[in-house]
């Protein structure tokens, strides 16, 4: 049981951005890149107070002299030392709280290796000494945020995309599908196709510029072939973008060729189904009686669903795949970039949730595997 006076901290550690704040709030207080940067060069000025590592926005702003690394790849933490730095930064610099005074709700991608959540639990209790914690599945939180208990969530972030069917609040594990193709792969793909135009982007810092181009200018075409014809025939789809050094680049069909890869992964040389087929297959793995509810409640969540045109295209593709009489509704909430965090905030402030926390005492008795018993 957790004391009611204490506000929970809600931390959604995405592969690309970390969203953090307090349970009960309607938006995260801190949103910063999940990155750690280390200097590429030797410091020469004494007394400059140069650090051997920078986290988040500070790493982003000094990116020209740093090598940037993301400790979370495809939703799985690959570097625990850096991850601990990000959490430290979250608590002490961004939220300015003592983690040993608040219960902490963390999030993770479905179908993650079990050891991943055990290690998260261990670090929270042993390094940060938190009184209580919980690990929730990201897509389930997004559904909470949309005010539903039944539906299928297509959650696509920077590192991983997954489709999670949920019925009356329970995720159906046998029907969860995961696609290791998301925002970061689209950024890499845009870097590649911009090279064909003669623009060269190679370093980790330049990748961040391309990510910005992607976020500002890309969109999903309703009909890809038709859009390619339009782009070839006129310059109406061209847009320009000013680089940090003042050089202006022009981008045309790349605007929709880049996100097309989540519908056609073969563009990236990846042998897998696009998000529309993955969503459909996920629904078809469920019991025949509940499919109707899933088709009518298909919820998009995550930063890689923010492209203009994605909901219409998704609707069109799933209508093509599904039985002709089926009612299909794609829900794309405007705040879907943060819906995982918002769902976490809602969950952490529910009175019925308070007995779900893993307490320090339970952890001391059972060790890290307690997380599999209490969080599902």
Swiss-Prot record:
Family: Belongs to the actin family.
Pfam families, alphabetized: Actin
Post-translational modification: Oxidation of Met-45 and Met-48 by MICALs (MICAL1, MICAL2 or MICAL3) to form methionine sulfoxide promotes actin filament depolymerization. MICAL1 and MICAL2 produce the (R)-S-oxide form. The (R)-S-oxide form is reverted by MSRB1 and MSRB2, which promote actin repolymerization.
UniProt keyword ATP-binding, yes or no: yes
Subcellular location: Cytoplasm, Cytoskeleton
SUPFAM superfamilies from the UniProt entry: Actin-like ATPase domain (SSF53067)
A single cellular component GO annotation: cytoskeleton
Ranges in coiled-coil conformation: none
Entry keyword set: ATP-binding, Cytoplasm, Cytoskeleton, Nucleotide-binding, Oxidation
A molecular function GO annotation: ATP binding
Protein name, UniProt field: Beta-actin-like protein 2
Species: Mus musculus (Mouse)
Stored SMART domains: ACTIN
Function (record text): Actins are highly conserved proteins that are involved in various types of cell motility and are ubiquitously expressed in all eukaryotic cells.
Superkingdom classification of source: Eukaryota
Principal subcellular localisation of the protein: cytoplasm
Chain positions found as Methionine (R)-sulfoxide: 45, 48
Note from the entry: In vertebrates 3 main groups of actin isoforms, alpha, beta and gamma have been identified. The alpha actins are found in muscle tissues and are a major constituent of the contractile apparatus. The beta and gamma actins coexist in most cell types as components of the cytoskeleton and as mediators of internal cell motility.
Listed CDD domains: ASKHA_NBD_actin
Quaternary structure annotation from Swiss-Prot or TrEMBL: Polymerization of globular actin (G-actin) leads to a structural filament (F-actin) in the form of a two-stranded helix. Each actin can bind to 4 others. Interacts with PFN1 and PFDN1.
């Amino acid at each position: 049981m957790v004391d009611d006076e204490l506000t929970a901290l809600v931390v959604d550690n995405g592969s690309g951005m970390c969203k953090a704040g307090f349970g009960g709030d309607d938006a995260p207080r801190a949103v910063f890149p999940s990155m750690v940067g280390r200097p590429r060069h030797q410091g020469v000025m004494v007394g400059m107070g140069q650090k051997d590592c920078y986290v988040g926005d500070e790493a982003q702003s000094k990116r020209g002299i740093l090598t940037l690394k993301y400790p979370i790849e495809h939703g799985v933490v690959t570097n625990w030392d850096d991850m601990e730095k990000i959490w430290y930064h979250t608590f002490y610099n961004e939220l300015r709280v003592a983690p040993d005074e608040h219960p902490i709700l963390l999030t993770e991608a479905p179908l993650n290796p079990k050891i991943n959540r055990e290690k998260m639990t261990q670090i929270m209790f042993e390094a940060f000494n938190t009184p209580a914690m919980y690990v929730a599945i990201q897509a389930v939180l997004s559904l909470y945020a949309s005010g539903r208990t039944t539906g299928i969530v297509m959650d696509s972030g920077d590192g991983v995309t997954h489709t999670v069917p949920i019925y009356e609040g329970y995720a159906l594990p046998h029907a969860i599908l995961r696609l290791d193709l998301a925002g970061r792969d689209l950024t890499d793909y845009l870097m590649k196709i911009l090279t064909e135009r003669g623009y060269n982007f190679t370093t980790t810092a330049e990748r961040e510029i391309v990510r910005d181009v992607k976020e500002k200018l890309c969109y999903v075409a309703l009909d890809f072939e038709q859009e390619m014809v339009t782009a070839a025939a006129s310059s109406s789809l061209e847009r320009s973008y000013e680089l940090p050094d003042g050089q202006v680049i022009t981008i045309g069909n790349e605007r929709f060729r880049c996100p097309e890869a989540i519908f056609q992964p073969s563009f990236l040389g990846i042998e897998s189904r696009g998000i529309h087929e993955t969503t459909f297959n996920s629904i078809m793995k469920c019991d025949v009686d509940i499919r109707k509810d899933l088709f009518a409640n298909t919820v998009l969540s995550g930063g890689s669903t923010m492209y203009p045109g994605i909901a219409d295209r998704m609707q069109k593709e799933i209508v093509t795949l599904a039985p002709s009489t089926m009612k299909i509704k794609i829900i794309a909430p405007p705040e879907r970039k943060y819906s995982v965090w918002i769902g976490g905030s809602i969950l952490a402030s529910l009175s019925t949730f308070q007995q779900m926390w893993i307490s320090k005492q339970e952890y001391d008795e059972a060790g890290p595997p307690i997380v599999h018993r209490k969080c599902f």
